[in-house]
Every structure is written in C-alpha cells, then in structure tokens.
Amino acid sequence: SQSMLSFILNGISILALIFLMSSLLSYGSVSRKLNTANEQRFSLTYNANRFMNGSAYLTNEVRAFASTGQQEHYDNYWNEVDNLKNRDKGVEAMQKIGITAKEQAMIDQMSDLSNTLVPLEDEAMKNVQAGNMQAALDYVYGSDYNSSITQINAIKEQFLSDLDARTLAKVETLERNARAIEG
C-alpha cells in the first residue's frame, strides 16, 4: 500500500511537471509572438508615417520653392523623389511586414491622389524658373491642389486609425493569452 501511494504521488508529480513544462513552453511561445506583434506594430506605424511624411515633405518643398524661388527647395524636392524615396521605402517595408487588402487600397488611393499633384507641382516649378511666382503659387495653393491634399489627409487619418486598431487588437489578444497561461 505504501508502494502504491508512492506510485500515485510519483505519477501526480510527473503530471504536474509535464503541465508546468507545457505551460512554460506555451508562455514562451506567446511571449515571443507578443514581442513580434509589438515590433511589427511599431514598424508599421513608423513606416506609415515615413510614407506620409515623404509626401508632406514634397508638398512643403514645392510650396517653399514657389514662395521663395530658392534653389535649395527645388533640390530638396528632387532629392526626395530621385534618391531618398521615403514614400516608396515606407510602403515596401509595410508590405514586407504585412498589411491588409483594405490598408493597401488606402495606400493606393493616397498614392493616386499624390500623383495628381505632380503635374501641378511640375507647372509650379516651371513657373518659378520662368519668373512667374504668382502663377507658381496659384498651382500649389489653388483649389485643385488643396482638394487633393484634403482628401489625402482624410485617408491618412483613416489609414492610421485602422492600422492602429488592427495591430492593437492583435497585441491585446496575445496579452490575454499570456495572462491566461500565467493565471
């Protein structure tokens, strides 16, 4: 009877040890997934802002060039377009991490609207170089330009809100899973 009691206690101890090891492995897995989800959330937000800030930078530089005629702003504009390419790099990084079809559609919408600004920006720069400062200002401060900027900003806000909600939900789910394993 004592050997039976030892056998039962040993069995219970082994089962408890197996359960403990399983819990530790599960917690480790969830913890790694949680760290990855947090890193991805940060990277997605960073690169979304990189994309949007690149676009805003181009607007600021073309407007500064139209206002002042200073070559520095013209050079900054084309350096962003030709070399830095923050918009493209931001989108590439987000796609590599993983975005939804809806998020990609919003990026495409913002890009399409941004591309409608290019002819206006081009005309503004040509007018500055020809000495027609008022015409240049009319291109980059006119209703067509401002309408596109307003639309881009509205999509941008929705995009950031959707991205934040999606990535936060993933993080919160993993946090709940971690607490369930701990608890």
Where would I find each of the regions flagged by the language model?
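Amphipathic alpha-helical segments and their boundaries
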Residues: S6-Y57, G98-L113, N177-I181
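Selective recognition of signaling/oligomerization transmembrane alpha-helices
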Residues: T167-G183
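Short, hydrophobic/aromatic alpha-helical segments in well-folded domains
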Residues: N60-E61, K170
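Heptad-repeat alpha-helical coiled-coil/4-helix-bundle sensor or tether segments in soluble regions
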Residues: G54-S55, T68-D162, R166
